[in-house]
Amino acid sequence: MLKKIIFGITISLTTGCFANSTASNLSKKDVAKTNDVNTQKIIDDFSVYAGTIKPEVREEIQKYRVEIVDINKKKRELYNRLSKEAQSFLAEQQKYKQKLSIPKLLIENDPKNNTANSKDNNDKDMK
């Protein structure tokens, strides 16, 4: 069943990309120009939004970002202290996690597995 779903998604994405590439009459320059205009509009919109942020909030965000940089440095230092074997294991583990992430998303979005409205969950909320 899962293989059929993945196969169906692959086919639909492939045919969709093919159809988009063959049906498009825009030249690469037109696409680039459109992307530049869209990008500039997004930047302008964000600048307007960012102008509404209070100075205290900006300072808070800056402090947050500095702390995140410090945390990431510490994570790199911890990782570099690991043995090569441990680093290799973590790299392989990450590859397996990435392989599992797509099927996991498909399963999570399956209506049969969605129990948010089940009677059991409603009973627990009422207690």
Curated annotation (Swiss-Prot):
According to Swiss-Prot or TrEMBL, what is its membrane topology?
Answer: Lipid-anchor
Which residues, per the entry, are lipid-modified as S-diacylglycerol cysteine? C17
Give the subcellular location. Answer: Cell membrane
Lipid modification (N-palmitoyl cysteine), residues: C17
**Signal peptide range in chain numbering:** 1-16
The UniProt entry lists the main location of this chain as membrane
Which residues does the annotated region (Disordered) include?
102-127
- CC per GO annotation: plasma membrane
PROSITE patterns xrefs: PROKAR_LIPOPROTEIN
Q: What is this protein called?
A: Uncharacterized lipoprotein RP051
User: In the record, what lineage is assigned to the organism producing the protein?
Assistant: Bacteria, Pseudomonadati, Pseudomonadota, Alphaproteobacteria, Rickettsiales
